[in-house]
Amino acid sequence: MGARKKISAEKRKEALKTMYFAKLQNVPTSPRKMRLVADMIRGMEVNRALGVLKFSSKEAAARVEKLLRSAIANWEQKNERKAESGELFVTKIFVDGGATLKRMRPAPQGRGYRIRKRSNHVTLFVDSKSNNEDQN
C-alpha cells in the first residue's frame, strides 16, 4: 500500500471511531427490495423508525429493525448511557449489492435459464440531533 493511501485509510478509520453505526452483511434479499425499506426510515427519529419497521409488511423490515436496534446499542455502548426518546436519528442508511449466486432453471427444449439470487450489505448510521447540527 502506498504512503498516501495508508494515510487516508488511517484518517477514515479514525473518523469511523466517532460515528455510531451497524452493518448487516450478506443478507439474502435483493438490494432493490431492501432499499424500499431503507428509504422508509432514512432521516427518522429512531423510536418512530422502529414503529414503522415493526408494522411494515415487508420481509426486509424485520432485518432492518434488528440492525437499527444494534446501532442504538452501539451508540449507548460508546456513550455509556441510555438513549432517550427523541434523541437519536437515522442519519444515513445505504444498501450495497453483495455476492450473487447463479443458479440454473430448466427451460424448454433442453435449455437452462440463469437465475440470479442476489444478496446485499446494509450500513446504518445513527447520531443525536446536536451532533448533526455541529457537523453541518
From Swiss-Prot:
GO biological process terms on file: translation
GO molecular function: rRNA binding; structural constituent of ribosome
Database matches in SUPFAM superfamilies: Ribosomal protein L22
Chain segments annotated as transmembrane: none
Signal peptide: none
Highest taxon in the source lineage: Bacteria
Pfam annotation, one family: Ribosomal_L22
GO cellular component: cytosolic large ribosomal subunit
Keywords: Ribonucleoprotein, Ribosomal protein, RNA-binding, rRNA-binding
PANTHER family named among the record's database cross-references: CHLOROPLAST 50S RIBOSOMAL PROTEIN L22-RELATED, LARGE RIBOSOMAL SUBUNIT PROTEIN UL22M
Sequence similarity: Belongs to the universal ribosomal protein uL22 family.
Oligomer and partners: Part of the 50S ribosomal subunit.
Function: This protein binds specifically to 23S rRNA; its binding is stimulated by other ribosomal proteins, e.g. L4, L17, and L20. It is important during the early stages of 50S assembly. It makes multiple contacts with different domains of the 23S rRNA in the assembled 50S subunit and ribosome.
Listed name of the protein: Large ribosomal subunit protein uL22
